[in-house]
Amino acid sequence: MEKNLKHSGTRSTEVCQREIDHAVFAREAAEEGIVLLKNEGLLPLKKDTKIALLGIGAEKTIKGGTGSGDVNNRESVSIYAGMKEKNAGIVSEEWLKDYHNRYEQARTEWKEQILEAAKHVDNPFDAYAANPFAMPDGRAVTNEDIEAAEAAVYVISRISGEGKDRRKRKGDYYLSDQEEKDLYFLNEQKIPTVLIINAGGPVELTDLLAGTENICAILNISQLGQEGGNAVADILFGEFTPSGKLTTTWTKRYDDCPAAEEFSYLNGNLETEEYAEGIYVGYRYFDSFGIEPLFSFGYGLSYTEFDIRLCGINTDSKGVTVTVEVENTGTTYSGKEVVQIYASLPQDGSRKEFRRLVGYEKTEELKPGEKEMLNIVLPAKAFASFLEEQQEWRIQAGAYGIWIGNSLSEAKLSAGVKVSADVMMEKTKKLEDHSEVVEIKDCAEELCRRAEEWTALLEELPNVSFEPETEEKKVCRFPEETEIPVEDLIPLMYGNMSEIRSTLGASGIKVPGTAGETSEALLDQYGIPSLIMADGPAGIRLQQTYEVDREKDTVYGTGVLGSLENGYLVGRKDHEGAERYYQYCTAFPVGTALAQSWNKKLMEQFGRKVAAEMEEFHINLWLAPGLNIHRNPLCGRNFEYYSEDPFLAGTLAAAVTRGVQSRPGCGVTIKHFACNNQEDNRMGVDAHISERTLREIYLRGFEIAVKEGAPTAIMSSYNLINGVHAANSKDLCTRIAREEWGFDGVIMSDWNTTVPEDGSIPWVCVAAGNDIIMPGNPDDDKNIRDAYKEGKLTEKEIRLCANRILKLIRRLS
């Protein structure tokens, strides 16, 4: 491979060894993230089965979401291609050919729509985000399509992405009319059917499953990246046993979700979002209020059976250690199992959820009859609740129930933990930014009754005493002072300004397609270089190909639209006398699909693969992983995020962070800090939320990632929290992240947060401890300098931010 050190990438289109190796890993990661939701003996399919492959995602499988979470990889494998690679007997070629033509026509029309809309807005990305591509329906499935079939594989795909929430309508959250007709037709013809859901989040299936008997298997594949089709084929034909587990509850009805009709655009109010459900998010709500879901949190089937046996439980001041033995009790298939541990807390005092995830571990691959012993550590703070009035995290005296299983719905009460006296785990200061939130009525009386039931059962189970100690506070180390004049330091407060304002993909100067860079204004005088940033979290987002003017040695730009959809919207233009370079990055599974592996070792491996590509393409900071909570299934960006549970999200993000940062010169940027839970009006929506809910649900994952992974950077979110933009919030950036958690890295804004008139205020970003405004524009510089001259912004505040930035540059450059 011909590698150029001045310009990133290669002049050759040859597939390099790194691409081959990373494709192998991407396939393995995709396989582990696939969740088997139903199987009535249909899977795995026999190799010689005659299959009707149908549905809009069969040949046009969605590899990932749109926007900054997309990856411009070389090529992706569809489910059709993956099955053809295994010489599957596909008998529906005519249907697939017809759909291919419909799809291409729809794409052409959509492209024209985007180009026209882009003429009438300041930022072309706004036109793109406001008009997401909707995959067209296929023609009706007929007898001719299935007459030779012994089974059907029907693929439902959904596109979602940055800038727009999913819609509560047919063809998005619900099945389209044509999908319903096709699936009922297959049922009437008694064709055993595998239903595959290829979407960034749930699709409602309750009525379909109630009205059919021949949908014998369901796979939730999420969006699996470039090797998705191969991974699905491996699962379908039994070459890999599914081991993925849901990280988000699938409800029977959308209206079962807490505050369902108050989300985003549904109540007609995009200015404020009332977090009225409080701590009852996802399974915490369904489990506490007794609402049965379609598929529970942590659920996922296998081709084999496992037995999970409690072997011991011990405690020390740091936490509880549960020892379990897992045995593959099947006779045919090897497989992996996830052991999940939930805790029930005392219900007297502050209201609490019925159960919460406090620990988990995944086995290695076990052959039939093989066993593995797991020691699962449940950290002390996982048992704590936040008390607003006392401003402390407290582990309450009383009995705690330990539930063990392979999903929330299958977890059994297995042991008890007794705490003799209240323990203050951490003392905090009251946040200045707050709102009065009217939360939904809790179910305290019912939870107390259920607590009496499970505490009585503890008498027949193993019990241990637990005496936790107050959490040791990590001290935030201030970086060394610099003697550089304060006026010269101000350019560090914003990014390396390109000639255009952009949302993504067009702010990079040195590496085409990167998101942006720190300022290099201090390079000539002080020798301080810039750091280069690239989007994620499903890989490295770069421009796949670009041209360099030989004479001027400058890169030909493509603009915002050229950075989207792998260049599809503007096409490729070859300039005379130019040299062309290629940047072939790997499209790994999206965040949700990776998280469905429940495999911390795999996540750390993933981080190391990302770091290898960062080094190859001269990237210092990866703008990932995404840690926002799956608060509602309609959030358009859920595919980037891991889970509805902060403990799971935080521990997985910490693993990815350790993987990336194991390679010198590579750092992560965990995002979006915090409450980035809707895309419609994402830059202006104000999240009204109680301090307890904020700390226990929406900040907890970030806290775990900071303390266990030590990320180099954090990205603040666009939205307001209790009336204050996240990038302007001293509560978030300084009091919580630095003073409470000991975070000593850099905090940067999301892109263009200061551009809207009612957006974040540049100088307040600096005062709050949001060190860098990205991607930077001249107005940011003027606003900060004016505030400093007027005394609103102090020299100390500027130097604090600058010193943190300089420390990071020294570490990564």
What is each of the regions a protein language model found here?
Residues 361, 413-418:
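Short amphipathic beta-strand/extended segments with alternating polar/hydrophobic composition
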Residues 1-386, 392-410, 425-813:
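Glycoside hydrolase catalytic-domain context in secreted enzymes
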Residues 416-426:
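Short beta-strand edge segments in extracellular beta-sheet folds
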